[in-house]
A protein has these predicted regions:
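Bacterial Sec-dependent N-terminal signal peptides
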Residues: 1-23
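Carbohydrate-interacting regions of secretory-pathway proteins
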Residues: 19-222
Length: 222
């Protein structure tokens, strides 16, 4: 009995140790204080020119007003990774999308020069559509053994809906590894693609007409 007891204790501590070690492999892309490691790009104003504070940080949250189309993008590139981001919608919407569903997005494998929108793979963040793929600017992939693209922009609709109601926090995960990309919404796999034609690049978060908040953006390189 004592032997079983001690074996259980050792097993418990081993599991906890491995979990802590795994958690520590994730590193923050957003530090909760400022936009260090990122720069902004706005369609009307260009790079690192944000006089109307479309992007700001307060109380540990990244606020994106959505008032202008653009994005913040990492200064460095990533190849194989597991990205975790937590977001929720704000209340405000702006032209030309003031009467449409709220829209945002996380693009990865960004390889082209700055523009709206650069060549990349997008994990759609939009009311009712979180987890859709957008293959932007002739990117290709294989989904369910069917070639997707190349066209200007190709949408691949998610297979499951697992979003929380507007105003609540949602957890988005993107796993990109050796040409296979997986989108996870609140712990459920909603979309997968293989043979993605991009394999490395930067990561961006869009501003696209809707007020959006992020409280966590972290990454583990694989």
């Amino acid at each position: 009995m004592n032997r079983n007891y001690y074996s259980s204790i050792i097993l418990l501590f081993s599991v906890l140790f491995l979990k802590q070690a795994d958690d520590k492999e994730f590193k923050p892309l957003f530090n909760g204080k400022d936009l260090g490691g990122w720069y902004s790009f706005l369609k009307s104003k260009g790079k690192s020119n944000d006089p109307d504070t479309i992007f700001s940080v307060k109380d540990g949250l990244l606020k994106i007003t959505g008032k202008e189309f653009g994005y913040i993008v990492t200064e460095r590139s990533f190849t194989n990774f597991h990205l975790v981001a937590e977001f929720k919608w704000g209340e405000k919407k702006y032209p030309p999308r003031e009467s449409r569903v709220r829209d945002n997005g996380i693009c990865y494998y960004v390889v082209s020069t700055d523009k709206v929108w650069p060549r990349s793979v997008e994990c759609q963040i939009q009311e009712g559509d979180c987890g859709d793929f957008w293959l932007i600017d002739s990117v290709t992939a294989v989904v369910d053994s069917i070639q997707q693209g190349p066209t200007k922009n190709t949408r691949v609709i998610k297979k499951k809906d697992n979003e929380r109601p507007t105003g609540e926090w949602n957890r988005i995960e993107i796993i990109a590894n050796q040409g296979k990309c997986t989108h996870i919404v609140n712990g459920v796999v909603v979309n997968e693609a293989e043979d993605v034609s991009l394999r490395t690049g930067r990561i961006l978060i869009q501003s696209e007409g809707a007020e959006t908040y992020y409280r966590k953006i972290e990454i583990k390189e694989l």
